[in-house]
């Protein structure tokens, strides 16, 4: 089933994961964010709004807003599923 996904589309997402690791020094620090579901949803919307407004790159990471939104959705999904198990 994984053959259906062109992994090259995720290159920007992986670059953002590397940026986060360099910035915070902890792998998977996004998993431990308080109120993760709400915060990752808000972050996703911010990046989508910036993209919709014509801003291609995030000023801090220098990566595409659309890639940041995709990564935020992945993080949001993780927190949603974690909270659903409670």
Please tell me what each predicted stretch does.
Residues 1-86:
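Intrinsically disordered, low-complexity regulatory regions
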